Amino acid sequence: MQLFTSFSLLAVASFASAHGIVTDISSGNDWWTLSNPFRDPYMNPVPDRVGWSFFGAGNGPVPDFTTKDIVCNQFAKPGKLSATIAAGSDLTFYWTVWPESHKGPVLTYLANCNGDCSQVQDPSTLSYFKIDHAGLEDGVWVSDKIIANNNSWTVKIPSDIAPGNYLVRHELLALHSAGQDLGAQFYPVCINFKITGSGNAKPAGVTFPGAYKRTDPGILVNIYNGIKSYIIPGPAPYVEGGSPGNSAEPQPQHTSTAVSTAKTASTSSLTTSVTITSQAPSNTANPPQSITTTTTPKPQSTNINPTSLKTVTTSLRREQLINLCLDDINRQIAAAQPKNGGPVNFSNIEKKREDCYKI
């Protein structure tokens, strides 16, 4: 029991400081908790979820977005349940605390499973059409807006979509290392849905891998040179009564729906009640009225550990050094986890995580 408790604290601490996952989703009065790679594998029995599991992947990015991992994350297995939602409804995604340095766009897709989504063994065989995206608008990254809105983002399910079983694919793309090949960091999650309604639209889609290219201007990009515009990867979102097309500037603006106070409070208590160190970012139930963005020096490496931090140039901000350190911790956590659960001793990793905050 002590091992599980220690590990749980380590996992949540890493959530609060580097990278992230979607923990919950909601629509109206309905709320669903998704699969958690740091918790669910160690529960007996392992709970059935509407979200696809990715045990062993941790909360870090997909290592190579040109592989099938880009669809639903590494080691992805279909959720055994499906959530029901009406076409035209809002759907809110609740992320763990997102690092301010991980600036980039948010993207959401739908794919018809052509049957029970829990029976889909290879999600790369499905066709995905985009229903929402947002990137850089008036100098503000959408990732900053997500942070300000208690680490949540709301999209609308198109009202004219034909009813059926759909996979919702939602992701954040972090661009802090995107100036180098394969440096863009994708954080995808897949969720099973049964969409109800009377629509008949069946938009054409794209496939993953393949929809994103290594040299796409929104993927291989230096965000530290004062860019004024940004081309979001993938196709343009489907418009009710219309059809998706190629993504090009100017990007359509996203109208975000505010998260209710009750749900915000629930998410806030989940992320703040287990914060271990004072340096870790904390969630807030009162988002700031204005958002400011800062131009920060580009991290010079994403492969670092606490013992080598003293050799890193001092031109980096302290929070960037902490992020680099925690990147390495996340990789160690993922490597230490057995794919199918089981006891693990994380004491050494916990010590290294504590050292990250002593920089």
Curated annotation (Swiss-Prot):
Biotechnological utility: Lignocellulose is the most abundant polymeric composite on Earth and is a recalcitrant but promising renewable substrate for industrial biotechnology applications. Together with cellobiose dehydrogenases (CDHs) an enzymatic system capable of oxidative cellulose cleavage is formed, which increases the efficiency of cellulases and put LPMOs at focus of biofuel research.
Region (Disordered): 241-310
Keyword Secreted: yes
Cofactor note: Binds 1 copper ion per subunit.
GO cellular component terms listed in the entry, alphabetical order: extracellular region
Domain of life of the organism encoding this protein: Eukaryota
Disulfide bond entries: 72-190, 113-117
EC number: 1.14.99.56
Residue ranges, compositional bias (Polar residues): 245-254
GO biological process terms, semicolon-separated: cellulose catabolic process
PANTHER family: ENDO-BETA-1,4-GLUCANASE D, PUTATIVE (AFU_ORTHOLOGUE AFUA_1G12560)-RELATED
Protein family per UniProt: Belongs to the polysaccharide monooxygenase AA9 family.
Cited function: Lytic polysaccharide monooxygenase (LPMO) that depolymerizes crystalline and amorphous polysaccharides via the oxidation of scissile alpha- or beta-(1-4)-glycosidic bonds, yielding C1 and C4 oxidation products. Catalysis by LPMOs requires the reduction of the active-site copper from Cu(II) to Cu(I) by a reducing agent and H(2)O(2) or O(2) as a cosubstrate. Active on cellulose and on xyloglucan for deconstruction of plant biomass.
Official protein name in the record: AA9 family lytic polysaccharide monooxygenase B
Species this protein is from: Geotrichum candidum
